[in-house]
Each structure stands twice: as structure tokens, then as C-alpha cells.
Amino acid sequence: MGETIADVYAESIDPEIYANNPAYSSLFTPYIHKQTIIADHVSVQCHIDLNGIDAVGSKFGNLNAHAGNFTSLCAPNCLPERLALVAYTVEYAFLHDDETDNAADQEALLLENKMLHQAINQSSMTSVSNRVSAKAQRKSEVQAKIAAEYLRLDPVFGEFFLKAWQTFTASVQDVRSLEFPSLDDYLEFRIVDAAADWTLYNFRWGSGITLTPEEEKIADPMSYVAYAELCLVNDLFSWDKEYDAHVKSNGEVPLVNAVHIVAVTQGLTHCAAKAVVQAEIRAHEERFCYLKEQYKATASPSDSILSWLKLLEHSMAGNWVWSLCVPRYFKVERNPYKDHLEKFGSEAVRVLTPEEHLRDSKQEINGTKEIELQEPKSNNTAESDVLAKYTSGYPTIDEPVLNPYTYINSLPSKNVRQTMIAALNSWYKVPVKSLLIIEGAVNFLHNSSLLLDDIQDGSVLRRGRPVAHQIFGVGQTINTATYLMNEALYLVQMLSPSAVLVYTDEMRNLQLGQGRDLHWSYHTHVPTPAQYISMVDGKTGGLFRLISRLMRSEATVNRDLDISQFATLLGRHFQIRDDYQNLQSDDYTKNKGFCDDLDEGKLSFPIILSMQSPGFSNTALSSVFKGSQKGETLSPEMKQYILEEITARGAFSQTKAVLRKLHIELLRLLMETEQKAGGIENWALRLLIMKLDLGDEKKKEAHKSDSAWKVNQRRAWKGSQKNGRPIDKACFLRAMEEASQK
């Protein structure tokens, strides 16, 4: 497989493009994807999405009229169904790199990467008011589109890839202030700074290549050599452009380039330093070939590793031939982006769009049929009730000073509600003043509910920290919570009378929903799934509907766009997922304690389903929950017993099936709402839905730390033989020089 992979989707490019060019001296033959038009389309689409159609071609990334698309050249065997996303992501990375490279001060650089990190992670977000400009809104949508699509196509890789992306953004803001005593020290960091590892992980996934942890470790030295070669080639061809930017900015734009490092550390002119970098490139390619042949000579070389090595060869050759005459580095007569847009039009390039089949609720998000759930019966309505239309009608009961608020507001947060506000503003275009009022009111209400929840549930931890009432006392915490409710109302009154009606309506829903939950837990009354979902619609869905209804009441466009059903289903998904994770997630154990819902005597969704399973006695479980109401903390052994009972009754599996059904319906409703909103795609909401999906819960692959590349560097250059003894890299370079002179 490793030797034939080039024949799947790749074809060789015309040798006339590079063979007679003295600047091309790679040992490898370049290929290009047969469907490179897909990569070209989405490269232009990224420009339109990010800056509008008039700005297409104002900056340069993938497209190269001379040799071809960067992604198509470096990943010529990318699976066609993944090529669009891979190329779109690389295009955005190019444009983001331009933003950071041109940042004339550290503060601007930090801001660019902070915004990217927040958009991907949807956490620690700054105020919504910082993201209401057209440019910021477009950028946020593009970032969310990328993240959501990876999570949709492959949740396990998507989570890993997004974490690797965050590592990349963090490294950029760190490395630019460092000095490097040698080229090897520089390359260790440059691999991450230039996103070489991140980009190749993307190409590997796109090409359908998977390595086990053991295979990854075997391939690491060869991967390092290839990554370093890619960085060196990039630095060599981009040197003139980067040096010009450095000079024009009077040194404010830093030089992060191998040519500069060699010149400084070895006391050479820039011309001589470029020659050294060229020699280093050849040395790394030679070393790659040597290590590859060594591996192929082992007893049973892995096809996966050989395929990965072939991809690395393609990437090295593709990067080189692309760099020969690319608009990013050199002036060209014609703009390939403008030419492509003129030839194909703006509609043709819109390749990366939401999946059309989601309009049919009977289909799964990934193209397979939806999980067939049992038709609801009179004694088991969980799966039908979960998609039922929301009906209001709760009676009123709302009672709403500042240290507990300051404390809980400082704790880490998933920022789901703030994310939702920013996302909905794509549709409603709420004035900034109103947007800030809504954001403040929702923040007050959310934190108020958390303070009261922790008291009412008897919680010990909140997000891994002590709960507020253990620090400030129960009385003060209650006083703060009620004060926050009043402050939220005070803010809402600044909007309009209709906004106040929305507030009071949803506060009724929220408080009665919470009251039902407390009543059931205290009296150990097991509700039906339908009753539970009705409670969730008030307790959790109320705040989501409050956001959507307040924003709709203040909207400047799409005032007839009602997303109450979407907000209600989002609340159901959020709460049922929280119930599941509390009993099954290691992260929840770390942040809240081991199955703390059991200590609280909370009758969560999996427990309700388990206690309604036919053929099982509930006597033991009921006794356990009655005991917890007397303040008895359950032992780990007792909790394990309960978990085993829930598992045996199939309640966890049924809960996951319900969550999956909600996930699919939320995505379908989102597409339906996007059409009603004039075709405005809301990728921030789509990303929020994807991040809430439990996925297949496969074991997540750990990302390498920066220091790991130093280890791989040593492994890559260890063991080369000359005259029967090991030699270091310097000797290896000298040996090459001697060989070239013979």
C-alpha cells in the first residue's frame, strides 16, 4: 500500500514546471490531486466568507497558477470528501498567518491568536460587544465553520485537531520573543510555530491514514526530519518577503526565519546563510530517505507508516514546487484568486456548506441512517417526548450582594450562553447597547441560578473549586442570588415593555421547573420521562429561550424569526447531556466529584429511565435515594453499584440514543432556520451543537508537547554510520559535502 498510494487520487505534474528550474533541488517527485478544482474553489470561498467578495485576492494562500494548489500538491491523495475542509482550513491558516506576521506589536499578535483560540474553544470569551463588527463577525463564523465541520466528520480527530490548533496559536505568541542559540534549537520550535505538525496531521487525516500510538512513536524521527525540511523550505523561499517587511517596519515585525538564525549564530552574510539553509534542506531529505530505507528493511513494516512516509514525501515535493513561483512570495502578472472567481463565479466556489440531507430528519448527520429508536409506548415516552413541541403556562414564582457573584463569575466556564448570544446576532443584528444589556442580564441570571443550585443540591464543588456558599455562607449567597435576579430585571427594563414581559414569562418557567426538580428529589418521587422533560423546559430551556426572545424583540432584521423550539431542544440536550456526563465523565468527576448527583439524591434522566425499566425491582435503588435525602454521603462502592444497575437496565444506552436524536434534530432545525433567516449560515451555533455531541467516546489521542520535538530531533540524527562508528549531525553534513566533491 505504501508504494502504491500515489496512484489513488494523485497524478504527476508536468516536469516542465520544475525540472529545469535550478531553484528546485528536491529529491522527491511532485504530484497533484486529480480533483484539485475542489481545493481551488474553497480557497476562494474562504476569502469570500472572511472578507467579502470584493476582497478576493487581496491576500494569497493556497492558489498558485504556476504549479497548482498548495493543499492539492502536498496532500495529493486526500479523500475527495475531506479535500474541501482540509483546503479551506489551510487557506484560513495562510490568511491568519498574514495577520500575525504583519502585527507590528506584541499586543496585536496576542489579540489575533486570542480571538482564534476563543472562537475554536468557545470558552473564556470576551464581551459580545467586541465581536459585533462585520469583520469580527465574519472571522468568528469562519473559525466556527472549520471547527464544526471537523467535529461533524470525525468527532475524535476533530477534538484532537482543534486542541492542536490551540497549541499552535499559543506557541506563536510565545516563540516570537525568544532567541535561539542554534539552528536545531530554532527548528524544535519552528515546527510548531510554522504549524508544520498541525498541517501534516490535517493532511494525514484527510488522506485517511491512521497511526496507532506505537506506530506514531516509530515514525516520529522520520516525521521530525520531514517537518524540519518543510520549515526550512518555507523559510528559504519566504526570506526576501519577510526581510522586506522587517526593514519597512523598522524592525517592529520580527524575523522568525532560518536564514536569520544561521546568519546571527554563525556570523554569516544573508547570502551565505541562505546557502547553509539549502545544504540543511538537502541533509534533511537525505536523512529522511536513509531512515525510511532502514524502516522498510525491518521485519514487518507497517502499511500505515509507509503510507504516512509517502505522504511526507509528497508534502516535501509539493511544498517545494509550489514555492517556486507563488504570489505569497513573488510578484506575479495575474491574480489567481480573481481569475478563478471570474471564471467560475461566486456560487460555484461555495463547496463547503451545511449538509443538505439534514433537511430530512430521517437521515443521520454523517450520511448513514438515523438510529432506529423504539416507537413510544404508553409506559415509555422518553424518546417521543424529547422532540415534543414546547408548551408554556407555568405559574409565577420569582424571587430573586456581591462577593459570591464575583467569585463564581471568576471560575472557568463553557460560556454556552454567551456563545449563543454572539451566534444569534448573525441573524438578528441587535444594536450594541441592547446586546450589552441582554448579555449582562443573562450573565446575572445564570450566575444567580448556579448559586442557588449549589445550595439546593448540597453541592461541594463547582467547576473544580469550592462552592460559593461554603466560602461566604448560605445566607449571603442566597441574598446575592436574589439580588442578581433583581439586577437582571433592572437591565431588561432598559430595553422595552415587551422585553420585560419576556423576562417575567421565562422566569416563571425557570423557577417552577427548578421547584419540580427539588420536589421530586426531596420526596424521592420518580417522574415520567415526559414530566422530566417538561421540568427541563422550564429549568434549563427557560434561559435559552430568554436569550432568543430578548434578541428577537431588539432585532433590526429578521424580527419574525422565532427560534423558541430550537432553544427549547437545546436546553433539553444540554440538561440530559449534563445528567449523563455527571455519572459517566472523568472530567465531571474532577470538577464536581464522583457522581455527585447521587449524593444529592437527584433523579436525573438516566436514573429515571432505569427505574422505569420493566422486569427490574426498584426497591434497592429507592432505598438508596431515600438515604441520600437524610444527608448520608454514598460510598464509592454504593455509587458503583448504582452505576452497574443503570447500565444493566440499558438506561445509559437509551440516554445516548435520546441525545443523538436531539443532536440530529437540532442540526435539522438549524438548517431550516438558516433558510428562514435569508440563507445566513450560522456556523457558531453549528459548532456549539457539535461540541455538545458525545460522539463515539473513543479514547482521545494526546498531542505532543513542544519538548517532544527535541527528543525526536535527537532520535532522527542518531545512528548514522561513518567508518563503523556513530556520528552526529555535523559529521553527517561534512560527509555529504565530501561526497559531493568526489
From Swiss-Prot:
Ranges spanned by the short sequence motif DDXXD 2, renumbered to the chain: 453-457
The EC number(s) this enzyme carries: 4.2.3.-, 2.5.1.29
Binding residues annotated for Mg(2+) 2, in chain numbering: D97
Annotated binding of Mg(2+) 4, by residue: D453, D457
Binding positions for Mg(2+) 3 per the UniProt entry: D453, D457
One GO-annotated biological process of the protein: conidiogenone biosynthetic process
Catalytic activity annotation: isopentenyl diphosphate + (2E,6E)-farnesyl diphosphate = (2E,6E,10E)-geranylgeranyl diphosphate + diphosphate
Positions of region (Disordered): 701-724
Alphabetically ordered keywords of this record: Isoprene biosynthesis, Lyase, Magnesium, Metal-binding, Multifunctional enzyme, Repeat, Transferase
Binding site for isopentenyl diphosphate: K414, R417, H446, R463
Motif (DDXXD 1): 97-101
UniProt subunit comment: Hexamer.
Protein name: Conidiogenone synthase
Organism: Penicillium roqueforti (strain FM164)
